[in-house]
Amino acid sequence: MYGHEFKELRLEQGITQKEACRGICSESKLSRWENDQVEVEFSTAMNLLNRIHITSHEFMGWSKFSPRPEIDPELSEAIEKENIPFLKRVTQKQLTKYHKNHNKFDLFMAANLCNQLFIIEHKNYLPPIDQKKLFAIFSKVNLWSQYYISAFGASIFLFNPKQIYGSSMQIIRNIDRLKEAETSFNLEIIMGSLSDGILRLISLNELSYAQKLVKELKKIELPQYLMFFTLTLTYLQKAIDYMKNSDDKPILTLISEVLDLGCSVQATTYLDMFKYLKAQRKKYNF
């Protein structure tokens, strides 16, 4: 039942029941729906939302009707904090849970935790058999919805180069379908997730895959308020160039310019990424 949440949004705007339901349904039916006594057809609900100037995306976000998996607060705390012993303990607990119930969402959460550990320690704690299962799930995705894109992005450091590139290209080919949903959040998580994937490819010196993905992401038409991703793509291109020719001046100049613009957090992130790539280059003699 979610009619009462519609009622709250209607009243906030000073719209009467009569105004809201005119030409859509009877006032008595709207009243019963708003009091959670009956349900209404999907088309009726959409028309009522349109009448009070609320999109379906907004309603799903504001209401409790939107289905959200319940996440253990301990998992959220482990993901947010860089307390390695605590993170490892929660990760093992989550893996044990998945091994008992084989629930796909629990595997995604375990992979998310392992991804965080990989970022900190550069070690993959997800067992090989679970890695295989995880990628098998993504390889069978036909419609890359927000659910799957988020799950892939939250575990992207756990995959090998071919897997990162293959799934990333599937997502990019699905862009037009995602745009039909009219939500820029999908574009945001795509750009963020695949940028992480490109960084992972660069760190493995898989520059051909990385270059192809940068080229494809640059083709995506972004709304103005997401144009900051063009800066990240520029950074990633300079990172690729650095790995090829060892000239660090262009990438350090860009980081300095970002800092001069007052974007200290982003500049620090870029610098940390560069230091990691530099260490990788030295370690593996790329």
Task: Name each model feature, range by range.
Residues M1-E12:
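A short, Lys/Arg-rich alpha-helix, primarily the initiator
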Residues E5, P73, M109-L117, S150-A154, ...:
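"A position-specific structural signal for the A-helix of alpha-solenoid helical repeats
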Residues G14-S31:
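Short alpha-helical DNA-recognition segment
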Residues S43-E58:
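DNA major-groove recognition helix of helix-turn-helix/homeodomain DNA-binding modules
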Residues T55-I129:
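Charged, helix-prone or intrinsically disordered regulatory segments positioned adjacent to compact structured domains
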Residues K64-D72, N101-A110, W144-A151, A181-G192, ...:
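Alpha-solenoid helical repeat architecture
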Residues Q92-H99, K133-S139, I172-E180, K212-P223, ...:
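Amphipathic alpha-helical segments of tetratricopeptide repeats
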Residues T96-S203:
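Mid-protein regulatory/catalytic core that forms ligand/cofactor-binding pockets
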